[in-house]
Amino acid sequence: MVFGFCAKCARPKMAVFQAFGGYQTRAGYGVLLGFAAAPICFDLKNLKYWLGPVAWDLTRCQSAQDQSVGMESSLVIIPVLNEVSYLWPLLNNLRAADPLIPVWIVDGGSTDGSVQRARLMCMKDPHLNLLINENRSQAHGVNMAAQCAYRQGYRYMIRMDAHAEYIHGFSTQLLRVLCDKNADSVTVPLIAMSQQVSGWQAANAKLQRSRLGHGNAAHRQNTGSGWVQHGHHAAFRLVCFQALGGYDTRLEACEDVDYDRRLIAAGGRIWQAGQLAVHYYPRAAPLGVWAQMWRNGKARAALWHKDKQWPQIRQVLPLGAALGLCMVPFSPLVPELALPAGLYLGTLCLATLFIGPRAALLAFVSHMGFGLGLLFGIFSIRAASAKARHT
């Protein structure tokens, strides 16, 4: 019996063989040692992996192992919340290109039948699994999937959104980019589109493609490929993701922004693959847009407080618009106070000529939601800090 290591899965295995009639001769022992040493030599590139997380150094987490691993070392996770209408088309598209890649659906408390649909699909697809995220938030769900995948020996995690469309062979091309560029994470441009010719979703998609919606964020436009500071998450090295502790689950949103900042600060590198742009379906209801932007505003305030960094101008403008409207009731006393609100509303009226009245109205809803959420988040943090100082 020979105790060796499997070069494919980097785990111990028992190999039984006989060389030239037995182990009694010196030649037999030589062959024995040669065959036993070969898989270990082939697997030295995976030494850090099968020894476990020992003093992991981010600058060295990418190595020659990329040249020998393939799709068998990766999996796809799909965070889901009430997206039953999108699941089936996404899985069909994915399976047409990658029929064997493991796919984990991570449900965060759907009430529209997504769980039932996922279970039916799992019965037909042996490589499809359903995980229930009892903590509900997307950060918790991704962290849970990443931890399970890392323990099972996966090295790369591909994240896909249910409410999106991907090019054929997306996962294979994405993994190739990650390995070729020796990156720690790969992001992709996120371009809004609609299933409707008209209606609120079409208006929201048009808004998200304009500067009033994305604020000139680079990853919301197809600006090409290159090294970036942030983008829409698509692929991770699990060793890097785990070493950084995954997403910060204390954040309601913007956990991707926080992760990218920590990754860059630790010496990691993020590559944006412009050729793999994702087209996604935004929210269709104004109330849903408001709730999303309110949550994003609060999370952005928490992120500023955590990082102690000055915000970008495009993130402050919605707050300025909200404060400008709040000053309108005092304009009879000081007429100049109406100027900011007038300038903002005039800009929205002008925007209707280019993006239409519905998109302009959604711009108002999203700006107010983000601005007031940001203001609420700032005051909440200050109140919590003051309370902590007095206890």
Protein language model features and the residues they cover:
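A conserved acidic beta->alpha catalytic loop
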Residues: 107-116, 164-167
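Catalytic donor/gating beta->alpha subdomain of glycosyltransferases that bind UDP-sugars
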Residues: 248-311
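Short, acidic, metal-binding catalytic loop of nucleotide-sugar glycosyltransferases
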Residues: 92-101
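Glycine-rich, basic loop-to-helix element that forms the pyrophosphate-binding segment
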Residues: 133-151
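Conserved donor NDP-sugar-binding/catalytic core segment of glycosyltransferases
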Residues: 169-202
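A recurrent flexible, glycine/aromatic-enriched loop bordering the glycosyltransferase active site
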Residues: 216-236, 252, 278, 309-311
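Short beta-strand-to-loop acidic/aromatic patch adjacent to the donor-nucleotide binding site
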Residues: 154-165
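Membrane-embedded multi-pass helical conduit in multi-pass membrane proteins
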Residues: 321-385
